Amino acid sequence: MNILYFYQYFTTPKGSYGTRVYEFTKRWYEKGHHVTVITGVYAKSDIRADKFIENQEFNGVNVKIINISIDNRKSTLRRIWSFFQYMLVSCWYALTLKADVVISSSGPLTVGLPGLVARYLRGRKFIFEIRDLWPEVAIELGIIHNRLLIKAAYWFEKKCYKASTHIIALSPGMKADIENRFGYSNITSVTNSANIDLFGTLVKEPDLKGLIPMTYAIYNGNIG
C-alpha cells in the first residue's frame, strides 16, 4: 500500500521533538508498505535541506523536505506564512504522488487542505490525525483574532472531519471532544508511545547459588 503522510514537524531520534511519525512510518515500511512523508524544516528537528525540495530516506521511508523554516520563535505572521507555503506545495504532492491512503497530521489546521485535495479530486482514502485541537489552540494562543477568520477556521475544521475516511485523535479527551461536537463515530484514539528497545535489554538476574548460607553486607550509598 502507498501511504502519503503530510506532517510539518518530522524528526528522527537525533532531533529534540516527538518521533511518533518516525517510529510509525518505519514500522509500516517494515511491514511492506511504501511510505512518503512530506515535511518542513522545524527548528527542533534534525532534518535540514540545502535545496527548496530535497529527498532524503530514513529506514526505507521517503521523506520529501520542503525547505520552509518553521520556528515558534518567529512572529505570528511569519509562522502563518510558513504554514500556507507548506500547504500550497503539499497540495501539488497530493495531486501528483502515488497514494492509496493520505494522512494529514494537524495542527496546524492548514495541513488538512492537501488531504481534502486527495480525497475530493483523486478519490483517495483520507485519514485526519489530530495532535492539537485547532482552531481552538490558535485562538487561545492569540494567533487568530479576527472573527471572520475564526468562523472560517471552524468551518474548515468541520469540513476536514466530514471528509475523513477515519479520524485519529492522540488522546481520549480529544476523541471525546470531537464526538461531542460533531457526533462522528469514525474516530479512534491512538496515543503516543515509547520505543522500549531504546532503553536496552533486561539484565539477567545473578545466580545466587552458592552464596547462601554465607552472610554478606551490602553498602548501597547514602539514602536521605
Residue ranges of each PLM-predicted region?
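N-terminal subdomain of nucleotide-sugar transferases
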Residues: 1-61, 187
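Conserved donor-binding/catalytic core segment of Leloir-type glycosyltransferases
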Residues: 4, 208-224
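An aromatic- and histidine-rich active-site surface loop
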Residues: 14, 83-91, 99-136
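Membrane-proximal helix-turn-helix segments that form the acceptor-binding/catalytic region
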Residues: 31, 91, 95, 110-113, ...
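Carbohydrate-associated surface elements
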Residues: 41, 173, 190-193
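A short, charged, and often flexible helix/loop element on the N-terminal side
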Residues: 61-88, 142-145
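Nucleotide-sugar donor phosphate/pyrophosphate-binding loop at the beta->alpha transition
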Residues: 82, 122-127, 136-159
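Acidic anion/phosphate-binding donor-loop and adjacent secondary structure
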Residues: 194-209
